[in-house]
């Protein structure tokens, strides 16, 4: 199916209640022709992994501003793997210190985008990395 739309789950793990950035990204991905499932705020890692499995997504995008990324993201990645979703592209955005980026890449988060990243850059990254 060469013209299959890329399916992206956009999720806000943890107690972070600020979702403006996630909604901007979700809109940009939709405008770029992708199918977007937005889970809303205050999602547990288990809820995110279950939604990714149920929705048969190509990409999981995690948005966080609370600083809890090093606690929450590894759990999401592990649950996705445990669910058999080993080929899903995982990306993350939000307030993520530069010193954490390499560790996030090592755990399987392929793209990490900070404040001010152009939406076109995120769209391009997803298109280039979804097989």
Cite the ranges covered by each PLM segment.
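Cofactor-cradling patches in redox/metallo enzymes
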Residues: 22-127
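Short, flexible coil/linker segments at domain boundaries that flank nucleotide/cofactor-interacting
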Residues: 1-5, 85
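N-terminal pre-triad scaffold of radical SAM enzymes
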Residues: 11-15
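Acidic, glycine-rich flexible loop/linker segments
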Residues: 129-131
């Amino acid at each position: 199916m060469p013209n299959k739309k890329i399916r992206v789950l956009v999720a806000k793990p943890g107690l972070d209640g600020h979702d403006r950035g996630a909604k901007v990204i979700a809109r940009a991905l939709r405008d770029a022709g992708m199918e977007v499932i937005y889970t809303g705020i205050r999602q547990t890692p288990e809820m995110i992994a279950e939604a990714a499995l149920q929705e048969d997504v190509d990409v999981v995008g995690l948005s966080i501003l609370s600083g809890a990324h090093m606690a929450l993201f590894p759990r999401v990645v592990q649950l996705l793997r445990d669910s058999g979703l080993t080929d899903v592209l995982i990306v993350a955005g939000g307030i993520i210190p530069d010193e954490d980026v390499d560790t996030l890449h090592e755990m399987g988060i392929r793209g990490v985008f900070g404040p001010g990243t152009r939406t076109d850059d995120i769209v391009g990254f997803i298109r280039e990395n979804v097989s």
